[in-house]
Curated annotation (Swiss-Prot):
Pfam family name, one: JAB
Keyword tags: Cytoplasm, Initiation factor, Isopeptide bond, Phosphoprotein, Protein biosynthesis, Ubl conjugation
Protein name in the entry: Eukaryotic translation initiation factor 3 subunit H
Summary of subunit composition and partner proteins: Component of the eukaryotic translation initiation factor 3 (eIF-3) complex, which is composed of 13 subunits: EIF3A, EIF3B, EIF3C, EIF3D, EIF3E, EIF3F, EIF3G, EIF3H, EIF3I, EIF3J, EIF3K, EIF3L and EIF3M. The eIF-3 complex appears to include 3 stable modules: module A is composed of EIF3A, EIF3B, EIF3G and EIF3I; module B is composed of EIF3F, EIF3H, and EIF3M; and module C is composed of EIF3C, EIF3D, EIF3E, EIF3K and EIF3L. EIF3C of module C binds EIF3B of module A and EIF3H of module B, thereby linking the three modules. EIF3J is a labile subunit that binds to the eIF-3 complex via EIF3B.
Family membership noted in the UniProt record: Belongs to the eIF-3 subunit H family.
Taxonomic source organism: Homo sapiens
Name of the coding gene: EIF3H
């Protein structure tokens, strides 16, 4: 089950009954060591997610919901979904877990797939690499190994290209999250970088044959668009917003680097003080020995020199991952527009 946090992500706490139910939907390849290699989504699910955002999403406000389906060998089939209702902190009487249980029970009564296989969330200009999403996906994936999170980008979709991606946490990151040790040494030992925190799973959208025939007929009847529109440049607002968000994350990364450098300087300074103290003790013991006096008693250096608390590095990895996402968005945007500029220049030279 999942408990929703307004506007940030959902913190999931899955029950054993849900995990057991998902296990019943597994095929031959549904053993614990298998990985989901493909996500198959019904077209109805995609439309429900889009409709949910259009009805309740506003600006930076995200919408979230539950994904239902089953696992067949190494393929996760998402056949239905339902949204988390929008509510505020004033709605103290609203029980999110009870709401999900009632929804799944109702779906089971009408013979619709009701097995919990993940969740979905909208994003604002690709801003989804957050601690809330990490904690939520870990809870889902820890209870149901095949769980995925679908990230829907309404801004890209509004520009004419459906943006829907499925992500899972990598096995290395799952182990680190289980240990709950995000110190620099632990992350270095696990060899985790921002590039290997999430793994993207390919998505295939499936429709019935009747829907495919209908789409084919509608495509034939639709008017042919003006070919010159293909060379129109996209709005610069998208690029400007991504650059602004990128600069904000770079500032956060800079502040985090300053904190880490301060920790390293304090650690180095303490090591020097500890070494100097040991040398003084050793010299004093040698002098006492030459005078025939007993050496000084041993002292617990860990009490005298308490090591500084290392800063958690998980937030730094998340910021780096979000910076990488913004860079990829900017790269994709500029590549498309530069291609159009070169094509327009070539056509102009040809016509002249």
């Amino acid at each position: 089950m999942a408990s929703r946090k307004e506007g940030t992500g959902s913190t999931a706490t899955s029950s054993s009954s849900t995990a057991g139910a998902a296990g019943k939907g597994k095929g031959k390849g549904g053993s614990g060591d298998s990985a989901v290699k493909q996500v198959q989504i019904d077209g109805l699910v995609v439309l429900k997610i889009i409709k949910h955002y259009q009805e309740e999403g506003q600006g930076t406000e995200v919408v979230q919901g539950v994904l239902l389906g089953l696992v067949v060998e190494d393929r996760l089939e998402i056949t239905n979904c339902f949204p988390f209702p929008q509510h505020t902190e004033d709605d103290a009487d609203f029980d999110e877990v009870q709401y999900q249980m009632e929804m799944m029970r109702s779906l089971r009564h009408v013979n619709i797939d009701h097995l919990h296989v993940g969740w979905y969330q909208s994003t604002y200009y690709g801003s989804f690499v957050t601690r809330a999403l990490l904690d939520s996906q870990f809870s889902y994936q820890h209870a149901i190994e095949e769980s995925v999170v679908l990230i829907y980008d309404p801004i890209k979709t509004a520009q004419g290209s459906l943006s829907l991606k499925a992500y899972r946490l990598t096995p290395k990151l799952m182990e680190v999250c289980k240990e709950k040790d995000f110190s620099p040494e632990a992350l270095k030992k696990a060899n985790i970088t921002f590039e290997y925190m999430f793994e993207e799973v390919p998505i295939v959208i499936k429709n019935s044959h009747l829907i495919n025939v209908l789409m084919w007929e509608l495509e034939k009847k639709s008017a042919v668009a003006d070919k010159h529109e293909l060379l129109s440049l996209a709005s610069s607002n998208h690029l400007g917003k991504n650059l602004q968000l990128l600069m904000d994350r770079v500032d956060e990364m800079s502040q985090d680097i300053v904190k880490y450098n301060t920790y390293m300087r304090n650690t180095s300074k303490q090591q020097q003080q500890k070494h100097q103290y040991q040398q003084r003790r050793q010299q004093e013991n040698m002098q006492r020995q030459s005078r025939g006096e007993p050496p000084l008693p041993e002292e617990d250096l860990s009490k005298l020199f308490k090591p500084p608390q290392p800063p958690a590095r998980m937030d730094s990895l998340l910021i780096a991952g979000q910076i990488n996402t913004y860079c990829q968005n900017i790269k994709e945007f500029t590549a498309q527009n530069l291609g159009k500029l070169f094509m327009a220049q070539a056509l102009q030279e040809y016509n002249n």
